[in-house]
Swiss-Prot record:
Name of the top EC class for this enzyme: oxidoreductase
Plastocyanin-like domain sequence ranges: 30-146, 156-309, 427-561
EC number: 1.10.3.2
Signal peptide (UniProt feature, chain positions): 1-22
InterPro entries associated with the record: Cu-oxidase-like_N (IPR011707), Cu-oxidase_2nd (IPR001117), Cu-oxidase_C (IPR011706), Cu-oxidase_fam (IPR045087), Cu_oxidase_CS (IPR033138), Cu_oxidase_Cu_BS (IPR002355), Cupredoxin (IPR008972), CuRO_1_LCC (IPR034288)
Annotated protein name in UniProt: Laccase-17
Example GO biological process: lignin biosynthetic process
Cofactor(s) needed by this chain: Cu cation
Entry keyword annotation includes Ribonucleoprotein: no
Protein family membership: Belongs to the multicopper oxidase family.
Binding site for Cu cation 3: 127, 483, 540
Sugar-modified residues: 35, 76, 112, 185, 201, 237, 297, 335, 383, 391, 401, 437, 444, 450, 460
Length: 577
């Protein structure tokens, strides 16, 4: 009888749905100096495992990831896993002096987190000073085993990560800019997977080549890791189908060109031509420019090569490929905001049964922040002049006119230990203290205030945030990245946001869900998110120059009442300041 009962129970257990448990993945990343040559210029740069860009990391939805980061360089270091929610694991998020003190020379730290409810293309990068110029790599999250993509399985998946190459040391560049108050020097080239390509001098051998077969579909995982530039990207004589943005599936649409801001990722399907075309095709990217400062006005190119038919393979195939006609794509104009707007408007969440768009329909708190540039007075002694907008001012940037001052202690630890006094203020304004015509004639006083201010939210608060660009020192697009959350972009527009009219046009059905949004130049973006993740979460412009100038702030989400709504305790190896 007991045996029959046991068999019956066992049979019932077999009938229950079996959970797809994740596994634990271990990685070790050594941050070390490495000599790298590009554009006939060799320099010693900060690398990951001696590679530039860093190695591809792969996990599946549901996996626990333990990444030991060992610092073997003179610089302090921290790594951010861009787009990972870090549910209750804020200690692993990575921004220096926000969620952790940086890892000092000769020290190590294990980033320990579980990937919950996420799959797609993300990336990792250094999150201190300008070290992410060389410390970055793809972070690919595959769906759970047995869970298909919402599109046909591609023949092959290819990460393509855009970056910027500087002949000079980027730490010296931002250090000089900070001292003089001026704009930093721009990059010498853009790169695809670390390679500038043949349109630059002394660079033909450093070209990314994508070898494809006719009649196949390739999933290109595009990542913009550039420091300071949004990019247009196109493949000559080919269209692509956009299927994902910031690791969220979108309603598929075809396009010849994509726009991708720093911090953003975009997955596209490339269907190759049905037969061998007897040609090769440039894949090019160049900047989308809205600001008034200097920029790197150059173009990176990779080459799409078709595998030749079998009868032409052999010793001469590489030579024959070299002799093929090479087509170039036509990219939008550098300042083509019309294209940027149309592309942005096409992005919609898939909003299917399996991948719903859970937009907060009821909002607990509404915030209105300005984002833009400003000035600080010269801090030089001996009446030395600055190189900012005037010879008595330095460039600055702010959110709601508060230029964020980086603390010397980690904010998350200060909050967790109850020792926040003198480290940060919990009083970030809900809206600008001094309203003005944000996109009209700028005010005479362009000075910012400086402080370490946090916005405090009770657990599970539903938030609506409108971010408004300003015309101070010129309107400009700002890609804003929020750590710890995805958000829904429910509205965008140009001019000043109208709280009475504009919300009527909000998309609350299938808005794009992402972690980095471009606030339009001379316009605004409205986002909604649910503050269901306790911790301190950085929000900043992903143009590194603007972040350095202070266009950043942080949200403090308090613990909830239940045990699974509370921040986990700090790990034993958390770095000390």
């Amino acid at each position: 009888m007991a045996l029959q009962l046991l068999l019956a129970v066992f049979s019932c257990v077999l009938l229950l749905p079996q959970p797809a448990f994740g596994i634990t993945r271990h990685y070790t990343l050594e941050i070390k100096m490495q000599n790298v040559t590009r554009l006939c210029h060799t320099k010693s740069l900060v690398s990951v495992n001696g590679q530039f860009p860093g190695p591809k990391l792969i996990a599946r939805e549901g996996d626990q990831v333990l990444i030991k980061v060992v610092n073997q360089v003179p610089n302090n270091i921290s790594l951010h896993w861009h787009g990972i929610r870090q549910l209750r694991s804020g200690w692993a998020d990575g921004p220096a002096y926000i969620t952790q003190c940086p890892i000092q020379t000769g020290q190590s730290y294990v980033y320990n987190y579980t990937i919950v409810g996420q799959r797609g293309t993300l990336w990792y990068h250094a999150h201190i000073s300008w070290l992410r110029s060389t410390v970055y790599g793809p972070l690919i999250i595959l769906p759970k085993r047995g869970v298909p993509y919402p599109f046909a399985k591609p023949h092959k998946e290819v990460p393509m990560i855009f970056g910027e190459w500087f002949n000079a040391d980027t730490e010296a560049i931002i250090r000089q800019a900070t001292q003089t108050g001026g704009g930093p020097n721009v990059s010498d080239a853009y790169t695809i997977n670390g390679l500038p390509g043949p349109l630059y001098n002394c660079s033909a051998k450093d070209t990314f080549r994508l070898r494809v077969k006719p009649g196949k579909t390739y999933l290109l995982r595009l990542i913009n890791a550039a420091l300071n530039d949004e990019l247009f990207f196109s493949i000559a004589n080919h269209t692509v189908t956009v299927v994902e943005a910031d690791a969220i599936y979108v309603k598929p649409f075809e396009t010849e060109t994509i726009l991708i801001a720093p911090g953003q990722t975009t997955n596209v399907l490339l269907k190759t031509k049905s037969s061998y075309p007897s040609a090769s095709f440039f894949m090019t990217a160049r900047p989308y420019v809205t600001g008034q400062g200097t920029f790197d006005n150059s173009t990176v190119a990779g080459i799409l090569e078709y595998e030749p038919p079998k009868q032409t393979k052999g010793a001469h195939s590489r030579t024959s490929i070299k002799n093929l006609q090479l087509f170039k794509p036509i990219l939008p104009a550098l300042n083509d905001t019309n294209f940027a707007t149309k592309f942005s408007n096409k992005l919609r969440s898939l909003n299917s049964k399996n991948f719903p768009a859970n937009v907060p329909l009821n909002v607990d708190r509404k915030f209105f922040f300005t984002v833009g540039l400003g000035t600080n007075p010269c801090n030089h002694k001996n009446n030395q002049t600055c190189q900012g907008p005037t010879n008595t001012t330095m460039f600055a940037a702010s959110i709601s006119n508060i230029s964020f001052t980086m603390p010397t202690k980690a904010l998350l630890q200060s909050h967790y230990s109850g020792q926040s006094h003198g480290v940060y203020s919990p009083k970030f304004p809900w809206s600008p203290i001094v309203p003005f015509n944000y996109t009209g004639t700028p005010p005479n006083n362009t000075m910012v205030s400086n402080g370490t201010n946090l916005m405090v939210l009770p657990y599970n608060t539903s938030v609506e945030l409108v971010m408004q660009d300003t015309s101070i020192l010129g309107a400009e697009s700002h890609p804003l990245h929020l750590h710890g959350f995805n958000f829904f972009v429910v509205g965008q527009g140009f001019g000043n946001f109208d709280p009475n009219k504009d919300p009527r046009n909000f998309n609350l059905v299938d808005p794009i869900e992402r972690n980095t949004v471009g606030v339009p130049s001379g316009g605004w973006a409205a986002i909604r998110f649910l503050a269901d993740n306790p911790g301190v979460w950085f929000m900043h412009c992903h143009l590194e120059v603007h972040t350095s100038w202070g266009l950043r702030m942080a949200w403090l989400v308090l613990d909830g009442d239940k045990p699974d709504q509370k921040l986990l305790p700090p790990p034993a190896d958390l770095p000390k300041c």
